[in-house]
Amino acid sequence: MREPDFLNHFLKKGYFKKHAKAVLALSGGLDSMFLFKVLSTYQKELEIELILAHVNHKQRIESDWEEKELRKLAAEAELPIYISNFSGEFSEARARNFRYDFFQEVMKKTGATALVTAHHADDQVETILMRLIRGTRLRYLSGIKEKQVVGEIEIIRPFLHFQKKDFPSIFHFEDTSNQENHYFRNRIRNSYLPELEKENPRFRDAILGIGNEILDYDLAIAELSNNTNVENLQQLFSYSESTQRVLLQTYLNRFPDLNLTKAQFAEVQQILKSKSQYRHPIKNGYELIKEYQQFQICKISPQADEEEDELVLHYQNQVAYQGYLFSFGLPLEGELIQQIPVSRETSIHIRHRKTGDVLIQNGHRKKLRRLFIDLKIPMEKRNSALIIEQFGEIVSILGIATNNLSKKTKNDIMNTVLYIEKIDR
């Protein structure tokens, strides 16, 4: 194939339509060097600004020389190049994580929105076979995605429909370690695939076909499940066990960097079935939140650096606090004004719950934790509930419960009113 054929494919697919700057992961191998040649030659036609990024893994004697040559190549092409050196104990997984962390740093620094890698169809076959041998979930057998949005960036693999034999033999660096069978992918490439092709000469095409078929099923299920609110457990549990599993797996596709194992997936299923309330980290910065008949999976929110102190309100004063206007002894007008009997003799404290909090009801002291459970108050509301305290005792949990002192005691002690109005934050 000629270079213009690759350009036409890129334009037809519209890979770079949404991007002005793209970072190319440049390893120095044949596939990435040819991708460099195509992208650098046709920057104008593709309407992109190309940035190069290379990781020197420091695993071979030649790697430092290759780094110097890539710097020369970038200078000749008048393109910026960013280079980082891997350190620490080497493994395929650590190296991959290091590379992608570095690429994201480069993208953040340069304002690029696309990361381009030279993965091709042969890589796809190896990946699917590796996942099959490891016993991964069916949806992962669709293989590497041609385009993948991760956070605010898009990973583009424009060579995924081409085999390595489609690339012309141009200047590149040969990684001799690829011939060694120390790593799993190398054993797949050098040993397992050649043996399987003896049984079926079209084995690679067969594997790619299975991957595409699984992808079609995955997309179809996602489309058909659009009308089901999976986060509503009444809806989810109205289906058979098999359908529940498929719907839940499809829901998890929304979080591409979550990647639950089979055991973790089974644990999530069990939590949804057995626990009434639950909030706990699950994996990769995500947490599972369940509140009775609803659940959601979301990124863990960063905590504020400083916690808000409790508010002290004195008699004959007003203050706006966390979406409410509190008026101590000064009447507020309106239909939706809450009124709580209090004493004018001392200040009022407004805060969130603390460990050991109790509320007096019907003459009995009840722990807030038990009260919230009995009233089925969602965890989010428990944490955000405002507590009104006076004389060291809880007078009211705003919108939830009030200290019901006897009428005589109330008349003797509570000689004014705290007026509360809901306002916009």
UniProtKB/Swiss-Prot annotation:
Name of the molecule in the record: tRNA(Ile)-lysidine synthase
Domain notes for this protein: The N-terminal region contains the highly conserved SGGXDS motif, predicted to be a P-loop motif involved in ATP binding.
SUPFAM superfamilies recorded: Adenine nucleotide alpha hydrolases-like, PheT/TilS domain
A GO BP annotation: tRNA modification
Catalytic activity field: cytidine(34) in tRNA(Ile2) + L-lysine + ATP = lysidine(34) in tRNA(Ile2) + AMP + diphosphate + H(+)
One MF term in the entry's GO annotations: tRNA(Ile)-lysidine synthase activity
Similarity field: Belongs to the tRNA(Ile)-lysidine synthase family.
Function: Ligates lysine onto the cytidine present at position 34 of the AUA codon-specific tRNA(Ile) that contains the anticodon CAU, in an ATP-dependent manner. Cytidine is converted to lysidine, thus changing the amino acid specificity of the tRNA from methionine to isoleucine.
The enzyme's E.C. designation: 6.3.4.19
Xref: Gene3D superfamilies: HUPs
Subcellular localization: Cytoplasm
Coiled coil: none
The entry's keywords: ATP-binding, Cytoplasm, Ligase, Nucleotide-binding, tRNA processing
A single Gene Ontology CC term: cytoplasm
Residues reported in the UniProt entry to bind ATP: 27-32
Organism: Streptococcus pneumoniae (strain ATCC 700669 / Spain 23F-1)
